[in-house]
Amino acid sequence: MPEDYTSLVTAMKALTQASAVTSEPDKVLKVAEDGWDTRPDADSYGEIYLEFETGSLDGDNRKKNRAFEGSVHLFSRKRDGEGWPALIEQTLTEYCDSCWRLDYHTHETETNLFHWEWVYQVEG
């Protein structure tokens, strides 16, 4: 996995740990337990939830110097995402110099969660 994407994930996790000290537990950003490729269960993740996914564009994660596609998913019960979408956007811009945005979209899920997705190509 490209170093920039690794540092981005580290930054996101640090950001979420910092949020855990809030006195309002419903606004704490939860991170997927393993950090990758999981989907939230609406009843078990509180108000807000973050996940990361990554993989090489050609499907072979073993080779070095590959272009990777990475994505960050944010789920929230509130339409404004408690301000997290803007903070995540800022973190993506700040920590991932080699990230090229492929897609960004939002929608409401079948479990009444609001979903933001940032998809990037990351040069290896």
Where are these regions (language model features)?
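Short, low-complexity intrinsically disordered segments
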Residues: 34, 82, 98, 114-116
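Small/polar-rich, solvent-exposed N-terminal microdomains that initiate assembly or binding
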Residues: 1-58, 80, 84
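Short, charged interaction patches at domain edges and termini
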Residues: 1-11, 52-67, 100-124
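Short, conserved turn/kink motifs that form compact alpha/beta structural patches or helix kinks used as
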Residues: 43-89, 93, 97-103
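Intrinsically disordered, low-complexity regions enriched in Ser/Pro/Gly/Gln/His and often acidic
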Residues: 29, 93, 109-111
